[in-house]
């Protein structure tokens, strides 16, 4: 009798275990498309036979997580996000430069054509109006291009400020999850909390490079690349934004006031800083140098000539004090717009002479830019090519990084992801085991009924 009762108990426990397995499998299938979900696995063990009772016992439910793969993902994501931020910003800058012949190069060509027309008829009011019109358009083209580059730097600065806010939001979330995990009862299911923690850490690593220390209880401590803590246990430490004294751009400081801006070289925050502090300033310097070289060359020739009244030629462009900011400050002399007779076309002062107009037109093909090694259009093309090359390199690097991240994600999915085929097989396995144990239970129960009936008849 006791043996049958033991078998009945063993069958019931096994049925419970198989039903639990079906529940776990169903949970996996339900979360097939849930971001950050890690596949659960039911762990069973043989129950030691004691007093004739054996069978199976549920050890627990384990999340199939590989900490090494998770760490590798957090290592690669910052580089991918950095390239993504740079690629996006450079695509905008590349577009803002305009197409060949429709930007600064086109404006310069039209001005030199106006100088050529003036040389054909130095006293023509129409030709002089053409110089004013095209000269003004060149200045406007430089001004607008300088503004576009400044807008790109300003956008990158705003993006940095937003990224710091996102970092602070995520670190607060991580600290809260640490507290929930640490306060959870010993046998509580904290797998969902760990999933949320992993998502938060992954999202944080997209913004900036972080160091993560995982503790045995499942909590995580986080620090930025400089070593300054962001999360320690249930406490989070905000990054703060201050404005640089001269430029007013964002500086990133830790909770103790340390400026870590220069160390932010990875993640989307690192890409935004590279755009703001390195790429755009480099383009601005090239553009400013071109504007300065152009204005200097044109003004020098103009001042060597004479206007219609026989007076020394004027500045075609208002004087520029320094190279820095030249593109934004370039302005056609407004006095010439109100009195075109002041435009110098003659090199001798004699009526009908066109020496200065010809000299101005000839500047188009002279190496007066980039330290007298390139023409103005060639210098502009060099800037366009530089932006194009940087943009292409960022795209290529992003593609390479994406392949690496995709490969790691594939490895991660093979370990932690949910496979419908695999789960369907497990579901069938648990179902059949349940049915077999149910049949075993029914058989033992029937045998007991027969035995009890027999004993009752004695």
Model region roles, listed by residue range:
Residues 1-458:
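S/T-rich, low-complexity, solvent-exposed segments of bacterial secretion/appendage proteins
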